[in-house]
Amino acid sequence: MFGLIPASLAAASPLPALLAFSAAPLAHLRPLDIAVIAIYFGMVVWIGFYLKGKSNTSEEFFMAGREMTAWIAGLSFVSANMGSLELMGWAGSAYQYGILATHWYWVGAIPAMLFLGLVMMPFYYVCKTHSVPGYLDLRYGGHARSVAAFSFAIEMILMSGVNMFAMAVVMKVVLGWDITFSIFVSSIAVALYVGLGGLRSAIFNEVLQFVLIWGGALLVPILGLAQAGGVSGLKRQIMTNMQSMTGVSSDSYFHLWRDTSHFAANPMGVHWTGIVFGLGFVISFGYWTTDFLVVQRVLAAHNLRAARMAPIIGSFFKMAVPFIVILPGLLGLVLLQNADGSRRQLVGEDVVAACSLNSSGQVAEQGGCTAAMAKTNLSPASQQKVMAGGDDAELHSYNQALPLMMVRYLGPGLLGLGITALIAGFMSGMAGNVSAFSTVWTYDIYKPLINKNGSDSHYVMVGRMAIVVGVAVSIGAAYLVMHAHGIMDYVQALFSIFIAPLLAVILFGMFWKRATRLAGFLGLLLGIIFSAGLFMWVKLTPDALATVALSPDAKPMAENVFRALWAFIFASVLVVVISLLTKPRPVAELEGLVYGATKLPKEDPVPFYKNEYIWAVLVVIIFAALNILFW
């Protein structure tokens, strides 16, 4: 999911900037590579047709029949958050900020995933809701559900379009494919396999995507480390050349926590309080425990124990993802080279756009390019080369670190596998958002507000129609991204604005019997408005960032975590105050919805090696060890 978007992808004009490229594609596919990509497209469509017969009822179509094993649900759960947009973005962030980017995979995911599995999942699963807005309806009533449902629906369509356009742009840059061709091929494939097989088809394709991403990307860090001389060699080379690039001690690139006691002491410009409370609590818990795109995968598990185990299984793989994402970004700092053998230095998307080349290979706007490069750490020789134009004059962005490393290390067949992994990631992001949109539209908007008495087959038909409409609107969103350079910033804001108030409302609803219907509705609605107000304040008055993040040294990445923290606090205060001023529901009505008012079903005893708490403790031990190791 796109909720945890890297700053490099949410900057002023991330995706449209890539359209500025006019030079040759980064890679040329051999017949074997093309065959690998064609086989992938054939497989995903075949899966949709194969599973159509198992997706005839609403429970089968929208919830995969609740038949998924813990392993399938767990892999799908973590895979839903492994879209290529995220992988490329965080590899680029690692190039910029070093190992600090790993926080978004560890402290920004693991505690929340364990909390979902062990604490929250029993309530989601026992109440048999089809969606997170469905839980809000049961706990707070229809008004709260409607706010959540419409917010989710808009977010999912926009995110599907962003993934669609991002894939098309990457294919243009890497392979030279036409933008429109890529958009329509991907949209037709997604509409076919999700429309036919529903959530079951989306889940199985996400598991396929998980395998492809690891298979396509694993060789890059292995071969890169070998060339760099291992971890010690990588550190030594970064120490040699990073001081001149950033002005920050390159030693900071290898520490998670040591340099976070002050905003100015680390490359990311964040403080440990923002990492722990803003990212580690509000953003992380808000995404992993309330975002329907990922929660839907766990709700598809075949029983409560499987539903609890799924996020725990996913957390093991989540801790390993930095090896194929963060490490290639770090390796790119020392291994990427220009054609003349000099070190290739990546820059921001705004610089790429300002220094775009015309058809003759010359910089189109030399004045703007000069001004943009002056704000970077590009060497004078590199800047002169860009201004001179011609071969090897083209700049590449941070977000291209992973594709550039793939092109460097993957040969025929393997390059096709790597490109297929990127395509699979983008299409999985599209499919996940479209399938979630279909469920939310059908169960949380259409059924309660338009047609409450339809037959089961009618709602399946509505769900399939919603997928077609969702894909069509996503195509429009993709072209909107193409022409609206700042939309990625607003898409990220849409997500971060919504999750903090939603988390507050759900936590109070699940753990405090006194929380009332009006408190849930107003806490969510006014919390969203408050968070949006903070976003617009910083957008219109950049100096306000220092106030929101509590430091004049804060960088844009800090704004996201602190805005989420303030929005959570604001919504929490509202829920508490309004609940104390209004009448609560009778405790008898809260059965299955709130701790202290619910008797959870008894589960049969299992061997210790199948006990979810044992595995959760193991995750905590590994998580703690990793943070200490890279402190």
Q: Which residues does each predicted region cover?
A:
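Membrane-embedded helix-loop-helix hairpins and adjacent transmembrane boundary segments
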Residues: 2-631
